[in-house]
């Protein structure tokens, strides 16, 4: 007789790739991003939404410098991670870009902390400057039990 795989077993093979807003807020708070370098949790949720739609598997190629943005925060391979194909990659976070695409977002949080520690702060993210900076961001954590 054949072996049946239960629903629970089959789910363990699936990688969680797209977060819900409040679920992400909890994960980022747990990872220590709330008020890190003076940026509220709402800033991070807003940025993640506009960069990746809360999708950890998101990638975007940038033809001008042949770099790629990876993961929930769209961390760039020219400066922050190594994808082994971007010319003159600095790999400042000392991380393989592929790690930023997994369901464990702690490497992305760790690298985001490194990014925001630079003088540019969250200004490193175009989406933050365009959609989040100086805005009322209270709706990004509204209704979340944090």
Curated annotation (Swiss-Prot):
Disulfide bonds join 22-144, 46-132, 81-97, 93-111. This is Lysozyme C. Its EC number is 3.2.1.17. Transmembrane segments: none annotated. Belongs to the glycosyl hydrolase 22 family. Keywords: Antibiotic, Antimicrobial, Bacteriolytic enzyme, Disulfide bond, Glycosidase, Hydrolase, Secreted, Signal. It is found in: Secreted. GO terms for cellular component: extracellular region. Residues 1-16 form the signal peptide. Expressed by the skin glands. InterPro entries: Glyco_hydro_22, Glyco_hydro_22_CS, Glyco_hydro_22_lys, Lysozyme-like_dom_sf. The active site is at 51, 69. It catalyses: Hydrolysis of (1->4)-beta-linkages between N-acetylmuramic acid and N-acetyl-D-glucosamine residues in a peptidoglycan and between N-acetyl-D-glucosamine residues in chitodextrins. SMART domains: LYZ1 (SM00263). GO terms for biological process: defense response to Gram-negative bacterium; defense response to Gram-positive bacterium; killing of cells of another organism. Lysozymes have primarily a bacteriolytic function; those in tissues and body fluids are associated with the monocyte-macrophage system and enhance the activity of immunoagents. Has antibacterial activity against the Gram-positive bacterium S.aureus and against the Gram-negative bacterium E.coli with a MIC of 1 uM and 8 uM respectively. No antifungal activity against C.albicans. Stable from 20 degrees Celsius to 70 degrees Celsius. Activity decreases sharply above 70 degrees Celsius. It comes from the Eukaryota. One of its GO terms (molecular function) is lysozyme activity. Residues 17-146 form the C-type lysozyme domain. Optimum pH is 6.0. It comes from Bufo gargarizans andrewsi (Andrew's toad).
